Amino acid sequence: EGTLTFYSDGKYASSLETHLSTDVPANWVKYQVPCVRLRDYLTEPVDFLKMNIEGAEWQVLADSEEQLRRIREMVIEYHHLPGLPRTLHQILTLLHRQGFEYLINDFDSETNGGVSSPFRLTSQSRFYLLIYARRLD
C-alpha cells in the first residue's frame, strides 16, 4: 500500500521496476501511482486471475502466498529483463508449494519483436513467458 513509481512510454511499454530509475529512456514519463496489495483482495475463492505486472510478479506472489490457495487457476506473464532479478525458479517453487500444477509457454520473436531467442541467453537478454497454473485438488 502507498505509492510506487510507474514509468510509461505512452504506448505499450511500461514498468514499475526500479531498474529503470537510473536508465529511463528519454521518451518515458514517470508517474507516482497509488497501489494496493493483491492479497487484500483474495479473501474469497477466485476462479481465474491474470497477472501481467511488468516484472513485479515475484514480489506480488510472495506477498500473497498464503492467499493463493483461494485461486483455482491463473496466467502469469513472467518478464525476464536486463537489470531485474531472475525469479522464475522462486515463482515456480511457490506455485508448487501452494498446490498448483503449471505449464510454461514462451513468446517468440516472430510475435513479439522485443524478445530474444532463448538460445542466445546473455546478461542483456529479454524474454517473456506465460505461466498457466491450475490447482488440481
What label would you give each PLM region?
Residues 1-137:
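Phosphate/nucleotide-binding beta-alpha loop and adjacent structural elements of enzyme active sites
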